[in-house]
Structures are given as C-alpha cells and as structure tokens.
A protein has these predicted regions:
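Short alpha-helical interface elements
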Residues: 114, 118, 189-193, 214
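Conserved small/polar residues in nucleotide/adenosyl-binding loops
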Residues: 221-223
Length: 223
C-alpha cells in the first residue's frame, strides 16, 4: 500500500496537519505515521550554503588577495545541529512506499527554499511532488490546501528567486565582511580596546544598523 508524505517546516505545524488528516497517527522518531500517510518536519533550515574554506582550505585565512570570492558553482551542506532530522526526512523521501510528497513548508519564498534545499541534498528526482499553499493553519484551510495542491514544478520561479536571493546575501556577506574586517578591523579593535574585531556586513543587518545609528544621532541632536 502506498502512502503520502507531508513535510512541514516545523514540528508544531506538522502536528496541525496530522490533526487535520484525522488518521490514527503513531509517533515515530522524527515523524508521525498512519496506514495512509506519513507526516514529518524540518526545524527551519536543515541545509545551508558552505563557507569558502569548504571550497579550498586555504580560504579559511582571510586575505585581500583572495577577494572577491565568486564561486562558479555553489556548495551546500547539512547543518550539523539538525543532521539527525535531515537524515530522517531524507530517508522518508526515499521510502519505496511513498508515492506522493506534499510540500507543506511555509507558503512563501523562504519556505519553498527550505524544502528545495532538502530535496536537492536528498537527491529526490522521480517522486511526485505537490505544493500545499495555505493562508492559515486551521483544519479547513489545511484540507483545502491538500485538496488543491499543485504540482511542485509550478513554483520553480519562486524557488529560483529564493536561490538567487540566498546567493546574493551570501556573496555580499562573505566578501564585504572580510573586506571591511581586513581594512578597518584593527582600527575598530583599537577603539574598542579588544585584540581583534571582525565587521559583519549583511543585506538586512547593515541597513537596520544604519537606521539605528541615524535614529540615535537624531535623538542626541535634540536640544
């Protein structure tokens, strides 16, 4: 007898799917299972982009000569802290009795990215994959999402945008953090009275930091 596999983004959401299915689910290690279905979960991201030293051990040492770091092909790896759950999900994806995979990660770009990375690392190719897109976690909405699930390929553009955003963030963070740390890290460390100071740069964090600094300056300028 074949079964359907439901993959949620987090355990709490997986529990809601299990309740909505109203099947006699039995608790297993990292998933729930009935005669008809298997429900499992990620714990947020299970896979991440590899640091430069995974491309070349020499890149562990920060140097201006090795910048910019622009790999032709990006490498990915399982996050060590969640390796056990990744292995559980990967094994379920490959189970012979699993006929259809329902992607139930959060309905959005990041949720799509979380699943695609898992499927990529697990090497899933020949399984039927369907996307559950819901606006809430009520029983009615979950069942509607399952009933109206579309082929996962219809979300390829969303996936592509997620991969592109992640690569952009990665390249900006790696290159500018190393560059500014090498150029100004010593000056910042001297000012702070520390031995060494790295300077972190990111698409979001740097903008937010700028907003905080601007707000603090405005506050101090008030007479």
């Amino acid at each position: 007898m074949t079964k359907s596999l439901y993959i949620a983004e987090k355990p709490s959401v997986a529990q809601e799917f299990a309740k909505a299915l109203k099947q006699n689910m039995q608790r297993r290690d990292g998933y729930l299972e009935s005669d008809q279905s298997v429900v499992t979960w990620c714990v947020g991201h299970l896979v991440t982009m590899s640091y430069p030293e995974k491309y070349d051990p020499a890149l562990k040492r920060w140097s201006l000569e090795t910048l910019p770091f622009l790999p032709e092909n990006f490498k990915y790896e399982v996050i060590p802290e969640v390796k056990k759950q990744f292995t559980i999900v990967s094994n379920l994806l490959h189970r012979e009795d699993i006929e259809t995979i329902y992607v139930c990660t959060d309905s959005g770009r990041e949720g799509e990215y979380i699943y695609r990375l898992v499927a990529q690392m697990a090497g899933i190719k020949d399984k039927k994959q369907k996307r559950v897109w819901i606006d809430s976690q009520t029983e009615e909405e979950i069942l509607r999402g399952i009933r109206e699930a579309k082929d996962e390929s219809e979300y390829d553009n969303l996936s592509a945008s997620a991969y592109l955003r992640a690569k952009e963030d990665y390249l900006m963070g790696i290159n500018f953090s190393r560059l500014l740390s090498l150029k100004y890290g010593s000056a910042v460390a001297s000012y702070l009275g520390t031995k060494y100071q790295s300077i972190s740069v990111g698409r979001v964090m740097t903008c937010v930091l700028g907003m905080v600094v601007r707000r603090e300056r405005d506050r101090k300028s008030v007479v």
